[in-house]
UniProtKB/Swiss-Prot annotation:
Protein purpose: Responsible for the formation of the pyrimidine heterocycle in the thiamine biosynthesis pathway. Catalyzes the formation of hydroxymethylpyrimidine phosphate (HMP-P) from histidine and pyridoxal phosphate (PLP). The protein uses PLP and the active site histidine to form HMP-P, generating an inactive enzyme. The enzyme can only undergo a single turnover, which suggests it is a suicide enzyme.
Organism: Candida albicans (strain WO-1) (Yeast)
Protein name: 4-amino-5-hydroxymethyl-2-methylpyrimidine phosphate synthase
Pfam families referenced in this protein's UniProt entry, alphabetically: NMT1
Signal peptide: none
EC number per UniProt: 2.-.-.-
A single GO BP: thiamine diphosphate biosynthetic process
N6-(pyridoxal phosphate)lysine: modified positions: K62
Keywords: Iron, Metal-binding, Pyridoxal phosphate, Thiamine biosynthesis, Transferase
Pathway annotation from the record: Cofactor biosynthesis; thiamine diphosphate biosynthesis
Tagged with keyword Iron: yes
């Protein structure tokens, strides 16, 4: 049986930052483009690139480092746009766990990670801090890093500031503790990368699907851009509409996550060339990409002007850190505006 339905696989169960995809469906933007999109949730986040690459699913979401590694491993996927730009990513832990800002404090600790590349990143970092991978215990957690930290199953784990870090902060508040006791050792700082772009969340698609359906890809991105524009202009209304469609979003915790995600959303959806160069080099350093590897991304299907890249990305990251601290304290919806 054949179908004109296009399948789109999220990188995990519905989360606050998936809002543009759901809004494009809720508000009829896909329908306006004559698209019928089936939004799917994986049972295992590590399956996404394999399912999209094998053609079992047409499109999906995945982080930049995973997208690069997937193509290098023979799964024909390409990034066609950006969803969440450079969310701060690192090793989350709690004050009093024996972990400090010194990476060597991780010796003997149980470190949780989502998928194999998280372990590869930590293993590579040990080389730079006088340690080996045998100096810590790796625990695969999927998306349950914060839960496992709170339960005591692990001492720390890899997460992003606007999701797992928020989960830890809010759990501490419920316990009557200081939310500032939720800490993060940022991987970009530890690895001296100059950006958190390796964890940028991307819209990806199967290469054969792109080649055979270029207009559908353009229309999909046009609908996503329209949804993104609406969300950025009307965050409260957009969040309410998402919550009506996905009642699991209607919690204080998820609202706080959305507020913290808000500044990271890519307004243009463009793949940032400089970020791809950095992560391509980082992938080679991690030995997951060959030396002659060419990054697998395209902006060909974005039909609006490409914005100018940020002049000083490291300064922008410093400003974003201050911005997110303010959001943590005050809440609300505010974008970082660079002069």
């Amino acid at each position: 049986m054949s179908t004109n339905k296009i399948t789109f696989l999220l990188n995990w169960e519905a989360a606050p930052y998936h809002i543009p995809v759901y809004l494009a469906n809720i508000k009829g933007y896909f329908k306006d483009e004559n698209l019928d999109i089936a939004i799917l949730e994986p049972s295992n986040p590590s399956d996404v690139t394999e399912l999209v690459g094998s053609g079992k699913v047409d499109m999906g979401l995945k982080a930049m480092v995973h997208t690069l590694a997937a193509k290098a491993r023979g799964f024909p996927v390409t990034s066609i746009g950006s969803l969440l730009d450079e969310p701060f990513t690192g090793i989350c832990y709690l004050e009093g766990s024996g972990i400090t800002s010194d990476f060597q404090s991780l010796k003997g600790k149980r470190i949780g990670y989502v998928g194999e590349f998280g372990k590869i990143q930590v293993d590579e970092l040990t080389k730079h801090y006088g340690m080996t991978p045998d100096d810590y215990v790796a625990v695969r957690c999927g998306m349950n890093v914060a839960k496992y930290i709170l339960e005591g199953t692990i001492d720390c784990g890899i997460g992003i500031e606007c999701i797992q870090q928020v989960e830890l902060e809010e759990a501490l508040k419920e316990q009557g503790k200081d939310s500032n006791d939720a800490k993060m050792l940022r991987i970009d700082k530890l690895a001296e990368l100059g950006c958190c772009c390796f964890c940028t969340i991307l819209y990806i698609a199967n290469d054969k699907f792109i080649a055979e359906n270029p207009q559908a890809v353009k229309k999909f991105l046009k609908a996503i851009k329209r949804a993104t524009d609406y969300m950025l202009a009307h965050p409260r209304e957009a969040w309410a509409e998402y919550g009506n469609f996905k009642p699991t979003m209607q919690t204080d915790l998820n609202t706080k996550k959305f507020q913290r995600c808000y500044a990271y959303f890519s307004e243009s959806l463009y793949n940032v060339h400089r970020d791809w160069r950095k992560v391509n080099n980082y992938g080679k350093r991690l030995d997951i990409l060959p030396e002659n590897y060419v990054p697998n991304y395209t902006n060909e299907y974005l039909s609006w002007p490409e914005p100018k890249e940020v002049d000083d990305p490291e300064k922008a990251q410093d400003l974003m850190l201050k911005h997110q601290e303010e959001c943590k304290t005050c809440g609300g919806y505010k974008r970082l505006v660079l002069a």
